[in-house]
Amino acid sequence: MSFSIAAFLVVLVVAISVACGLFANMITLRLSTKKLGSAERQFGENLATQIEEEGVVMTKNDNKTLPLDKDKHSKVNVFGWAATQWIMGGSGSGRSVNSSQGYTPDVDFLKALSDYDIEYNQKLISMYKSFQGSRPFWYDTLNTHDYESCRLFEPSIDDKSRYTDELLNEAKQFSDVAIVVLGRAAGESNDAPTVQYKNYANKGKVPAANIDKTRTFLDISTEEEALLSYVGNTYDKVIVVINSTNTMNLGFMDKIDGLDSCLIVGGTGNKAAGALPRVIYGEVSPSGRTVDTYAYDFSTAATYANSGMPGVGTYNNTTNLYPATGNNPNVGGSDNKYPGVSYLDYTENIYIGYMWYETADAEGFWTSDFAKNKWGVNGYQDVVQYPFGYGLSYTQFKTDVVDVSPKAGSELTKNSKITVKVSVYNDGPVAGQHVVQLYFAPEYHRDGGLEKPSIMLAAFAKTPVAVEPGKAQELTLEFDVSDMATYDCYGKKIDGGAYVLEAGKYQVRIMDDAHNLTAVRSGSATIDYRIGSDIVYDVDPTSGKEVKNRFTGEKLTDGFAVDGTTSGEGIKYMTRADFETSFPAERAANRDMAAELKAKVLYTKADAQDWADRHSDAEMPVMGSGGDLRPFDGKKATDLGLELGADYFDPRWEQVLDQIKSSELDALVLHGYVQENTIASIGKDKTSSVDGPSQIGSFNQIPGTGFPMPTVLAQSFNTELARSFGLAVGAEAQAMGYSGWYAPGINMHRSPFGGRNYEYYSEDPMLTGLIAAGVSKGSLQTGTYLYAKHMIGYDQESYRDGLYCWMTEQTLRDVYLKPFKLAIDKGGLTGVMTAYGRIGAVWSGGSEALLTDLLRDEWGFNGAVLTDYADHHNFMNGDQMIRAGGDLWMDGLMSKGSFKQEKTSAAFRQAERNAAHHVLYMILNAAYIHSNYDPSADGITISSSDIDGGWWLPVLIVGDILIVGGAATLVVFGILRKDKKKAAAAEASESAEANKDEETPDAEA
């Protein structure tokens, strides 16, 4: 028995030790109890409130309903079940949690009202809570289906068991103010559904009776519509609060009588809902602007038919190819099989968001027979409710144009910069901030010209503080003429691809939003320029390197064109030359996959060999030279490290890289999940990175500040506020022992239904890129590097693993890559994270055309490239990544990644050496920037520390020793006991023999 127990204990120790070894990094992070200091916490919470204050968008305010008078309206009725389940943000890696790791904010809207000394109708709220206690499953979109995580709950206003006559009559007596809360939440792995699942709380599929197929998740439900109609007809003042992670259809605000005001507040994070009463009662004037176009009908978007789950196509002949060969871990857990190999056609071309709606208006599309017949509209006013950049205030501003350079009427040159100085004068009754937006409208050449929107955001600025009544502030807006160029991928103007500024007329416009000119008091809101002849940008103005097609044509590094022309996709892309016949009204029928595409579904030994053949001239690098250069002292940069961080091309880098051992290179590259591994040969300890565009450490024991969702930050239109956000999160990261941050999320709001839209900024590449640049600047000043995500084509969640994303190279560059380029060039960004899907036919994390040809050879990017979490190692694999130009493989929670192809060639070892250079430069560059930053200028405290969750390791070791020692004791005890038994048995046997000998003679006698 002792031996059995001992064997069990030894097996247990081995099993626990192996498991802890595999999960050591995550266990340490999860168990960390490192708390923010009071200074960091206070700075973060104050900033979160400011972000919410500046990000709230007021879209309607009839009869100056807002602001409310606190003396007259100290009591309010809060209607809508969503008020009891206030949304902090979306689900997934960008989530926010409260101080106890829960999903209900420490300060929700109701608590915010109470804290502001506003009394709300408790009986009304109690009724909602008794109707449905919580929003089930929404916080776990990674493990649920959309029909579980995206459900709507609202009692019918006609249900007298809920809305009793007594309850409604008392509510009218309680207050003449009704605030109606509408809530929507989506998240990672599930796009918002195009149907409604209602009033069903059980896990699993929703009964047909609880599904409304006539409305989408982002429309109001019939129950919400009836409630809004009731309060609109009953109450003197009605304010609608939109607490949503996604752009809702707000057409009801125009159609239902009595709805006075509307505030878009987004997900407010853990405590920033406290800002809302300050806005509602006029302590703060709204200054946010919409970052998406609000249309009356989602289907008027050119992306509608080819987005979300309904927009995904499935190749007919791919049932035995990845990922159809396994389960989909990203949509509803392990019970959901992939139907086949999926693809997504970006048939809308470059025309997303306002770039579609405004261009369609310029072309008369909204008054065409097509539009009239399909949607029953007759003009822009029937299609767009709130344009991009729209927002109201409690005050009025008058704009004076102070100076323009170059002067109106000038001919622009290749390297010109356009500068517009304006003065904004507060002509209203209260203080407030104001946003000025600058757009350009290029001339479009229908015959043979490049695709281009009718209008594009070029620059924006916001008054840094509230302007007092009767006072003015001056703002300067500027942009490079090269920002107006569009990419020519089909050789219309130049063979081989380049950015081109076509000859013609260009008008710069000062605008209130993407549709309406600003009524300036002096000067002109429009500035006309001209380009005499085509200007070609075939050299990148920042890097000085060649610009050319990387994804279009026949001879391509990745083997396939991103637009599908070389693989027989037959995609018809929309063109401005003929919107009516090219508008993608419905998704095309599923098609077959070409044989040559089938052969490249997964990375193979032959692919690795082909790469090696193309790099056969590589020389074997020196490894493990044993030198004594130390750019690191543990996690900290030495003086040498700071000097190397200042210059990627410092010749001493070669000596440092020579010292790194091959085993250290392997460990660094292979195991990049939330860490940059130890490199003892140069003095570097393991550094840790953390996820969370809204909140660092949201998956750990003690999280950082839960900020409003990133979209709210973008709604502020304030790049300096974005820098402050980067400062705050970077400082928190340092205080909690982290060196890197998985942020910002800078994919596009291609569709309102994108599950992770809340993590991303907007539908506009310029706004997205400039906000991201601000965040990057601030974070780097604290010494915290960032991995901006997700590069590229990750604009929806449905079937994200291995999704083939087909688009033109112009679309790729002008829309989706532009935010990354801006963040790198203007924000100093030194880290990017790749995506789950494919850019065309090739996984983005393994695309040599993307990571080497474009990112490094064209853009001159010297930082690190990290993959996203590798669910399937046979697809998102380290072999393909390192050869394509990636650096860190996020091989997963168990850190079990390994190379499957050869790793002894000179080319391979050189690729690993390059990866180390990129990663180390990223880390040291952040340290260098921090060393030249004075935090006192921003009133912030930055104190670095180590993660303290590693206490469990010595405890485990001691426990192992005690258990093994106990097992050994049992074995020894068992042996001794066995020996004792044997001795006793032997003694008994001898005694028996003696007795036998004595008895024998008597027997014989």
What are the language-model segments listed below?
Residues 1-514, 550-1005:
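Glycoside hydrolase catalytic-domain context in secreted enzymes
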